[in-house]
């Protein structure tokens, strides 16, 4: 039985010509979000951060970027994310075309020591030789980069150093050269997450030796 990848963070970053976030524009965003988000102080001049503590979601805006982050036990909802980002897009009078980057972070039960299992699975040399070359070797990471138009993707698997009973899984996908609608972005983000938790997870288990 496949051990699931538990989502810990989903982040979607839209590049957009937002411009100066005046106090009036900030208030319009807050009004449109109907009190669900509260402003949060950030050490970046001109940036605007909003947090929904109940849902563990955050929005971060600069003059050139709109970023959505969900943390905790994430259950990504394309429709909710589209509604939320769409409200901000409309208040700021942005065109519905964005280059975007997504990042997904997950943890996966190692069913043992993630340190040991990555050394056994990922070393190009016999593990005993690798340990001789690197005394005190703790673990190894694997990074896979690939393209699936319009996306350039990056998948990383390594031990979770704060708790070696788990693997740390990170997946990035970016469409930096292609402008996409918000509806397409959240749909594709949902599809990538499903693939990460499905076929990619199956491949990860195969690479790790089951």
Regions found by a protein language model. Give the residues of each.
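Mixed-charge, glycine-accented linear interaction segment located at domain edges/termini
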Residues: 147-210
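Charge-rich, solvent-exposed alpha-helical interaction surfaces
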Residues: 32, 84-87, 118, 203
